């Protein structure tokens, strides 16, 4: 029986960046890893309704920088930045070093695998039919410009006695092509019948140029300078 490798793990360093980017010696590594885990756990619990896509952690010179990618930045920031300041203080306490929190807005949540998976799970928990939720997610992604998408839901679908998986795919999702930009993520729906697992693969196109091209695309675009017109004398 063919098993699939994790689409993000196999592309790390090729077209996918790491979620934690720091270096540490042998003594500090375990502590840093543990505090990363606790910071992520705290932020996911605290910002459960803020549509969090991913949390990137950097550690420059005895401090911690956390970048939260979210579709709803207003909820994270709060009124006059009160909420984000509270998050910063708690993250600094957990990590034991000064903290900085940056917010990055996800422009197209329909093309983000984590947000799509969370959207499907919230619909399943509200007792919406799983086929309708899957089809809606696929149609929205294709409408926003995805080259392909696959959605799989597994568990006691519709309250059935025997658990089974069902999937729906549109377009192409090339899992073996390493330069393919495939966003993959999972989520869980807790229903009265038990837990339903949701997996989402979104193919956004091929990245030519490797990590250099990815890093260039993630940088904010520089605004072109306005040229001053020389007046006629």
From Swiss-Prot:
Q: Which CDD domains match?
A: KH-II_30S_S3
Which segments constitute the KH type-2 domain?
Answer: 39-107
GO MF assignments = mRNA binding; rRNA binding; structural constituent of ribosome
One GO biological process term:
translation
Q: Which SUPFAM superfamilies match?
A: Prokaryotic type KH domain (KH-domain type II) (SSF54814), Ribosomal protein S3 C-terminal domain (SSF54821)
GO CC, one annotated term: cytosolic small ribosomal subunit
InterPro entries assigned: KH_dom, KH_dom-like_a/b, KH_dom_type_2, KH_sf_prok-type, Ribosomal_S3_C_sf, Ribosomal_uS3_bac-typ, Ribosomal_uS3_C, Ribosomal_uS3_CS
**Record keyword Ribosomal protein present:** yes
Keywords for this protein: Ribonucleoprotein, Ribosomal protein, RNA-binding, rRNA-binding
Instruction: Note the SMART domains from the entry.
Output: KH (SM00322)
Q: Name one Pfam family in it.
A: Ribosomal_S3_C
Q: Where is the signal peptide?
A: none
Q: To which protein family does this belong?
A: Belongs to the universal ribosomal protein uS3 family.
> According to its UniProt entry, what is the function of this protein?
Binds the lower part of the 30S subunit head. Binds mRNA in the 70S ribosome, positioning it for translation.
Question: Can you state the subunit structure given in the record?
Answer: Part of the 30S ribosomal subunit. Forms a tight complex with proteins S10 and S14.
Q: Supply the name of the protein.
A: Small ribosomal subunit protein uS3
Gene behind the chain? rpsC
